């Protein structure tokens, strides 16, 4: 699929390179370049000790590709993936951002996902958009406590050792807009783009956390707890 949009002012594909051929969109002084950013936080309850949840997350080559669907995922090295986030655009201008991600090894119960370069990336697309994807999963184990022997049978399942996985995602997208869009009121262009990105971040996070939670419990033969409301 050709993701290079047409510039309404010229009728041709907008393939303008950065001003000096090397400066990326993040450092560009081009007035058409817009930054849209959004954050999201959520919580997954896993009915297993943190060590079991950690062992599952360590094997990301299985769960990440399964749970990221329907987003397109391709492997990138030993710990990375190329992820297509879905369509993002404003006022008829659309791109389908693709980003390289690296899943870093656990450090003190925290897993981090960071942006890495995509090899052989299309230079024309790199002149249109840039993505910074930073996420973390923190494992917090909650135990039944010292009075477990005093609880009723009905409470055992509720109070069994379980782990809370706290998910946070910060996503920033830089886009070089067609000149036609920049004649619109500045606040309108910014707020509409921010709103759309919030929807995308929310959708990515909700689907990913739900699927990881369901996949973990299914793979361990454990009943999956009900979904929690998202924390925005």
Task: Provide a role label for each language-model segment.
Residues 184-231:
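A conserved amphipathic terminal alpha-helix motif
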Residues 125-194:
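Beta-strand/loop substructures that line and gate deep hydrophobic ligand-binding cavities in soluble
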Residues 76-78, 94-98, 106-110, 128-134:
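Short connector loops at helix/strand junctions that flank enzyme active sites
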């Amino acid at each position: 699929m050709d993701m290079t949009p047409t510039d309404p002012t010229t009728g041709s594909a907008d393939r303008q390179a950065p001003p000096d051929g090397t400066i990326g969109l993040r450092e560009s002084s081009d007035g058409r370049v817009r930054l849209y950013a959004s954050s999201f936080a959520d919580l997954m309850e896993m009915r297993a000790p943190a060590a079991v949840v950690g062992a599952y997350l360590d094997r990301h080559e299985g769960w990440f590709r399964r749970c990221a669907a329907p987003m397109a995922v391709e492997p990138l090295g030993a710990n990375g993936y190329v992820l297509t986030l879905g369509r993002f655009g404003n006022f008829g201008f659309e791109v389908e951002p693709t980003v390289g991600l690296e899943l870093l090894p656990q450090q003190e119960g925290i897993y981090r996902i960071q942006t890495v370069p995509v090899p052989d990336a299309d230079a024309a697309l790199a002149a249109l958009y840039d993505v910074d994807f930073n996420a973390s999963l923190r494992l917090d184990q909650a135990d039944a406590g010292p009075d477990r022997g005093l609880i009723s049978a009905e409470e055992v399942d509720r109070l069994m050792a379980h782990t809370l996985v706290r998910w946070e995602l910060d996503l920033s997208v830089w886009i070089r807009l067609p000149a036609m869009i920049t004649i619109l009121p500045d606040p309108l262009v910014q707020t509409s783009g921010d709103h759309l990105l919030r929807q995308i971040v929310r959708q990515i996070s909700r689907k990913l956390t739900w699927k990881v939670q369901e996949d973990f419990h299914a793979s361990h033969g454990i009943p999956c707890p009900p979904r929690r409301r998202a924390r925005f």
